[in-house]
């Protein structure tokens, strides 16, 4: 199929899982499919389940990054048979199945551990709820692939530029950090209710809102795609009333979403389904 862009590099892929039931994310995701190149470009696509989610994740990768000449997989049935095999045949991508018991031949499998470590480090640093792990995975992969690395094959370029040949746009990444305090505008409120509300930024909102939109969690624990938001000013960070508001915000989120150490005691309903098309 010619509607997909092409990339001239072999891609490795592997699946990593969260702890079942206890740490199913707020969006219902239980695992991620990681795609990686020899230059260490990395991206991850969410999946509700491995069996049904892999063809959708593969389609999303082909649409957003491009079709490689070959895809190296670990030999799981859903990766080498059925819809995935049919899709790869249609787009002209060769599937290379690794021999069983050779995990180090798959670069993606090695890098999954590094990605998990970075996600855990960011969530621990910011004390963000463990239920938000999938948002953090996406934020980490975008940041890792959009900055320069000391790699002799990159020629001073970012990983994404090396992959696609296009300049890397970091406009929607550089301004807000993971789980950073923000004030966002919600215009559904009427006077005398305030238009600005306190929230936590969870990274770029793909497939929702506009290009600059960010996922923002409000005080009720709901995640919304927001375009109009800003960092807290210095006076807001030091004001005692604002400090108390942030403490109340965190206490409410911990009750609804859990902490960086433990998940919530009560079941949390699914909010947002991953969108691919």
Feature annotation, model-predicted:
Residues 156-157:
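Terminal low-complexity regulatory extensions
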Residues 93, 97-153:
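Surface-exposed, charged/polar loop-rich segments
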Residues 1-115, 161-277:
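Retroviral integrase
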């Amino acid at each position: 199929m010619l509607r997909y862009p092409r990339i001239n590099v072999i891609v490795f892929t592997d699946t990593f899982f969260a702890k079942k039931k206890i740490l199913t994310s707020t969006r219902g995701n239980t695992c991620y499919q990681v795609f990686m190149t020899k230059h260490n470009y990395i991206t991850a696509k969410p999946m509700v389940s491995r069996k049904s989610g892999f063809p959708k994740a593969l389609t999303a990768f082909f649409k957003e990054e491009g079709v490689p000449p070959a895809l190296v997989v670990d030999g799981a049935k859903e990766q080498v048979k059925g819809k995935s095999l049919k899709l790869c045949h249609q787009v002209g991508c060769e599937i290379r199945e690794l021999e069983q018991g050779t995990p180090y031949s798959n670069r993606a499998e090695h890098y999954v551990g590094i990605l998990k470590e970075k996600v855990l480090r960011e969530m621990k640093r910011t004390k963000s709820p463990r239920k938000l792990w999938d948002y953090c995975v996406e934020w980490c992969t975008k940041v890792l692939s959009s900055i320069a690395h000391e790699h002799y094959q990159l020629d001073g370029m970012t990983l994404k530029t090396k992959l696609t040949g296009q300049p890397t746009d970091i406009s929607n990444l550089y301004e807000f950090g993971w789980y950073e305090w923000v004030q966002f505008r919600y215009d559904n409120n009427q006077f005398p209710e305030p238009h600005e509300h306190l929230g936590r930024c969870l990274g770029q909102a793909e497939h929702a809102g506009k290009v600059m939109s960010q996922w923002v969690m409000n005080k009720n624990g709901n995640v919304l795609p927001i375009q109009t938001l800003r960092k807290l000013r210095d006076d807001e960070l030091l004001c005692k009333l604002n400090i108390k508001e942030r403490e109340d915000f965190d206490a409410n989120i911990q009750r609804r979403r859990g902490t960086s150490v433990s998940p919530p005691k009560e079941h949390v309903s699914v909010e947002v389904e991953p969108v691919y098309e």
